[in-house]
């Protein structure tokens, strides 16, 4: 056994090259044991490597590399490993090889990324030896079938050639494509490179044996290429693949921005006419009934039309197909279907609201109850609670009246057809001036009903805002117009809002500043930024500054690194409100990206800024950046949640609520629990609201603490001595927890993984309730119905059942509160003598014995029945009728029933609106549409007027 390497090292001083070679071979064998000794003579080995004439110089490099590796000098070790050429065996599993390969990939990645950011002429050549090792590594991954690893390294090193090769060579191409698309959506920090990767994915998807158009369109949304999407839709119509086209249109509406959709619609309109010449689609017959009848939600549908015969089925004319596609893309169909779902499945527990109403004693809690009611009934069109409590509602005055009127917009969200008729009593009239607060609230409500789907209502709101003579009406009009024209970047709307901003009126300016951001959402419009930042630096009104702070951030929505210059200048501003705007801009520009640089900036500001509002905003903004990986958020904010500064603690609570919304994340709830007992009341408010955001639609099985928190909200509301701030939080939390009749969830991303723009905007503006209660209503933008809606070829809902393969109680609605039984007043007992009392007692006992004997037999049989009932096991599955309420976690266990005639066009596990292919020739049974609540009730009450003609007969 060798105890020293001195003898071998001495051979390196020999003249004979063969002896030196022999020494190197021996040293290579013992280097792991004697590296410390060899390191003293490593210079001799280096000299051998540098000697061009030495035959085994590569071997010298290998030994030197191993010595430096043991010394911890990884860079030198890597250099010599590269010098060793093929002697450095990438397939070896030793720790040395693994470490050097890791360093090699890091080094190569760094060089590639630096090169990618340089212009064409300035790119530095990458070391070929480095590339050689990386290529060997890729080959090793492919040989070992470690495709995900290869894709990861290929994306890290910007090697698109390898990326494409890996996907195509893998044994599961669709799986690898899905994995790559997910990486693209969630982890790619650089927009330019992401777009290149998406182009490669589009190419692969299109070249599949059966092109995957649904995923191609998802990529094209990211690439912001509406023309390519239009081409695909046109191609599908030509090929008579209509159902696929409809499915893509629904997916587009859910994931793409308004501008993107309007471009696709524009392209389809120009396409509309020439398609008629396509063979196979020139049939003269049309679908039974005109396009109007094909509206899935037409309330006037004739009772006889619930069965559609297959024989009547003839290809619809292309124009009709295009108009249907435009109707889907415009969002009209999805909004109507969701409205139907929410009305049909409304499961609100009015007892909760009644108890809260009876407990509140001041105007702040009154407003909170009105807001909570609108959340609970969001989109259900049910204003039952308000109708039952008109006298109580009338207590709202001034801005509370504004908020209460606007809450109708949340209740009737998506109820667009009758919106103007519905809100008529609250809207400005030419004849008599009404209450300004009511009219302003009415205009704001119209915006909430049409949020992100303005259409014709934009022009109505535009005119109302032009003619408004009062700052309160202008405030409501600006908010309504901003909501309806969200993301449209319409110049006429922008100019009018700018005019309102420049009037330097605090009330109007606050709403106009925010609305400017809503209209220019994500446009990165340089002129808009210049106008808004310029005015923010001039104005003396804090309210206007607050509105602009959020507005500026919205203009940079989703712009990632393109917003860095603006963020930099805002963060350096001496005005704390503009620094806060900088935090929101980071949140909006990098939302959902998980960008480390953005997180570092926010964390730095959260602990270093001198202003509490800025620090709070910085921590809140973390939630927006991390929402794709909610499990990371608790660890990031756990220390901040224990900060000495209550504003930072509040921010940490809200960040958890935003990031983990709807997930029921246990770690987040564990962090919030102690905060609900915080000594500072507004921290408790934040913790209560955040807990509801996280636990929305969770059941006791999916999230055991939900009932505990329900009791906590109730306790805080009913405690006469508790603080108003905490009560406000608890009331809002109740509303959020049961939102949309227990049928909606808050999610910042769409089902397909895109950042859901209205949700992000809604949650950001909702957080501003800290300054201005009426902005609470914006949360309704983030409510997404948890539904699966199947549609047939005519875009109607067929009667079909889905099978949920888990126990019904897992995702059941919470049980309603029991109505407390009224206690009977106890009568004062009259005095009874002891002798009579004893006699009565004996009599009673005798009667009791008789009765018991009679009852004995009956009781026993009854008890047996009860036991049998209790023992009856809960079934392991449940059948749900279309349209079905299906929770996100439940989607995994959802399937079509075995004997079902319909086949879904995309997996049910994605949820949402799914086109179903009918495999049967029989008649179809359709789901009858339900009528919306609201104005219909008033009409029915007014109907008895026409008996005037009968009066003449009486005469």
Swiss-Prot record:
Signal sequence, renumbered to the chain: none
Segments of skewed composition (Basic and acidic residues): 290-303, 842-854, 861-874
GO molecular function: enzyme regulator activity
Taxonomic superkingdom: Eukaryota
Pfam families listed in its UniProt record: HEAT_2, PC_rep, RPN2_C, RPN2_N
Compositional bias ranges of the Acidic residues kind: 938-955
Location of region: Disordered: 279-313, 839-879, 932-955
Gene Ontology CC annotations of this record: nucleus; proteasome accessory complex; proteasome regulatory particle, base subcomplex; proteasome storage granule
Assembly mode: Component of the 19S proteasome regulatory particle complex. The 26S proteasome consists of a 20S core particle (CP) and two 19S regulatory subunits (RP). The regulatory particle is made of a lid composed of 9 subunits, a base containing 6 ATPases and few additional components including PSMD1. Interacts with ADRM1.
Family listed: Belongs to the proteasome subunit S1 family.
Function: Component of the 26S proteasome, a multiprotein complex involved in the ATP-dependent degradation of ubiquitinated proteins. This complex plays a key role in the maintenance of protein homeostasis by removing misfolded or damaged proteins, which could impair cellular functions, and by removing proteins whose functions are no longer required. Therefore, the proteasome participates in numerous cellular processes, including cell cycle progression, apoptosis, or DNA damage repair.
Name recorded for this polypeptide: 26S proteasome non-ATPase regulatory subunit 1
Originating organism: Gallus gallus
Gene expressing this chain: PSMD1
């Amino acid at each position: 056994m060798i105890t020293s390497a001195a003898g071998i090292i001495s051979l390196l001083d020999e003249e004979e090259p063969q002896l030196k070679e022999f020494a190197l071979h021996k040293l290579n064998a013992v280097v792991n044991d004697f590296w410390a000794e060899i390191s003293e003579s490593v210079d001799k080995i280096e000299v051998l490597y540098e000697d061009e004439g030495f035959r085994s110089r590569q071997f010298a490099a290998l030994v030197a590399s191993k010595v430096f590796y043991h010394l911890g000098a990884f860079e030198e070790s890597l250099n010599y490993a590269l010098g060793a050429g093929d002697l450095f065996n990438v397939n070896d599993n030793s720790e040395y090889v693994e470490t050097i390969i890791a360093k090699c990939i890091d080094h190569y990645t760094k060089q590639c990324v630096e090169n990618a950011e340089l212009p064409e002429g300035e790119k530095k050549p990458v070391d070929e030896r480095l590339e050689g090792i990386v290529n060997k590594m890729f080959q090793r991954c492919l040989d070992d079938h470690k495709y995900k690893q290869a894709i990861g390294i290929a994306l890290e090193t910007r090697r698109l050639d390898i990326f494409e090769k890996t996907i195509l060579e893998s044994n599961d191409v669709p799986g690898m494509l899905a994995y790559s698309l997910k990486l693209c959506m969630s982890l790619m920090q650089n927009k330019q490179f992401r777009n290149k990767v998406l182009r490669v994915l589009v190419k692969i998807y299109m070249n599949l044996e059966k092109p995957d158009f649904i995923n191609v369109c998802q990529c094209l949304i990211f690439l912001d290429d509406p023309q390519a999407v239009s081409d695909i839709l046109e191609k599908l119509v030509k090929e008579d693949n209509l159902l696929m086209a409809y499915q893509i249109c629904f997916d587009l509406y859910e994931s793409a921005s308004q501008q993107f959709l309007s471009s696709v619609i524009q392209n389809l309109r120009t396409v509309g006419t020439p398609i008629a010449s396509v063979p196979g689609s020139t049939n003269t017959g049309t679908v039974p009934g005109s396009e109007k009848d094909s509206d899935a939600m037409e309330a006037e549908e004739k009772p006889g039309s619930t069965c559609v015969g297959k024989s009547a089925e003839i290809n619809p004319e292309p124009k009709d197909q295009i108009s249907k596609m435009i109707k889907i893309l415009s969002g009209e169909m999805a909004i109507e279907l969701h409205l139907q779902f929410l009305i049909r499945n409304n499961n609100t527990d009015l007892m909760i609201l009644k108890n809260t109403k009876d407990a509140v004693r001041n105007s702040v809690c009154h407003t909170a109850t009105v807001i909570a009611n609108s959340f609970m009934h969001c989109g259900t069109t049910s204003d039952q609670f308000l109708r039952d409590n008109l006298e109580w509602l009338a207590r709202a005055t001034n801005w509370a009246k504004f908020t209460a009127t606007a809450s109708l917009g949340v209740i009737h969200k998506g109820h667009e057809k009758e919106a103007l008729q519905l809100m008529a009593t609250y809207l400005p009239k030419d004849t008599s001036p009404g209450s300004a607060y009511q009219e302003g609230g009415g205009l704001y409500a119209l915006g909430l009903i049409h949020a992100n789907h303005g259409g014709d209502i934009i022009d109505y709101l535009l005119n109302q805002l032009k003619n408004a003579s009062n700052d309160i009406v202008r405030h409501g009009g600006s908010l309504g117009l901003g909501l309806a024209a969200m993301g449209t970047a319409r110049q006429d709307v922008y100019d009018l809002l700018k005019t309102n901003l420049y009037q330097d009126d605090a009330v109007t300016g606050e709403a106009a500043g925010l609305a400017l951001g809503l209209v220019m959402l994500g446009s990165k419009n340089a002129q808009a930024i210049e106008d808004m930042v310029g005015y923010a630096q001039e104005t003396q009104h804090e309210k206007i500054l607050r509105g602009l702070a959020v507005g500026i951030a919205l203009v940079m929505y989703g712009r990632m690194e393109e917003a860095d210059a603006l963020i930099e200048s805002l963060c350096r501003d001496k005005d704390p409100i503009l620094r806060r705007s900088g935090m929101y801009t980071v949140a909006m520009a990098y939302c959902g990206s998980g960008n480390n640089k953005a997180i570092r900036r926010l964390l730095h500001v959260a602990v270093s800024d001198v202003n509490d509002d800025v620090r709070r905003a910085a921590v809140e903004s973390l939630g927006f950046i991390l929402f794709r990986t909610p499990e990371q958020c608790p660890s990031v904010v756990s220390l901040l949640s224990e900060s000495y500064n209550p504003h930072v603690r509040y921010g940490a609570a809200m960040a958890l609520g935003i990031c983990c919304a709807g997930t029921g994340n246990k770690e987040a709830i564990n962090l919030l629990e102690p905060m609900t007992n915080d000594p500072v009341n507004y921290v408790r408010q934040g913790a209560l609201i955040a807990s509801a955001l996280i636990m929305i639609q969770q059941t006791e099985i999916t999230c055991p603490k939900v009932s505990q928190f329900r009791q906590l909200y109730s306790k805080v509301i009913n405690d006469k001595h508790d603080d108003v701030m905490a009560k406000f939080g608890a009331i809002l939390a109740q509303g959020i927890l049961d939102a949309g009749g227990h049928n909606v969830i808050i999610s910042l991303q769409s089902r397909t993984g895109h950042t859901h723009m209205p949700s992000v905007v809604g949650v950001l503006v909702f957080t501003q309730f800290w300054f201005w209660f009426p902005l609470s209503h914006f949360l309704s933008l983030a409510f997404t119905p948890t539904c699966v809606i199947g549609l047939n070829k005519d875009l109607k809902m067929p009667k079909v059942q889905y099978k949920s393969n888990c126990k019904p109680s897992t995702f059941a609605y919470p049980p309603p509160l029991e109505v407390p039984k009224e206690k009977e007043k106890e009568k004062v007992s009259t005095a009874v003598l002891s002798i009579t009392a004893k006699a009565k007692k004996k009599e009673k006992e005798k009667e009791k014995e008789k009765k018991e004997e009679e009852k004995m037999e009956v009781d026993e049989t009854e008890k047996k029945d009860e036991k049998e009932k209790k023992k009856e096991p809960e079934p392991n599955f449940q059948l749900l009728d279309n349209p079905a309420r299906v929770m996100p976690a439940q989607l995994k266990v959802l399937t079509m029933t075995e004997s079902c005639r319909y086949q879904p066009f995309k997996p049910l596990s994605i949820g949402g609106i799914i086109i179903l292919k009918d495999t049967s020739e029989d008649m179809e049974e359709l789901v009858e549409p339900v009528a919306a609540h609201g104005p219909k009730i008033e009409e029915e009450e007014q109907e008895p007027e026409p008996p005037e003609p009968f009066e003449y007969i009486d005469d």
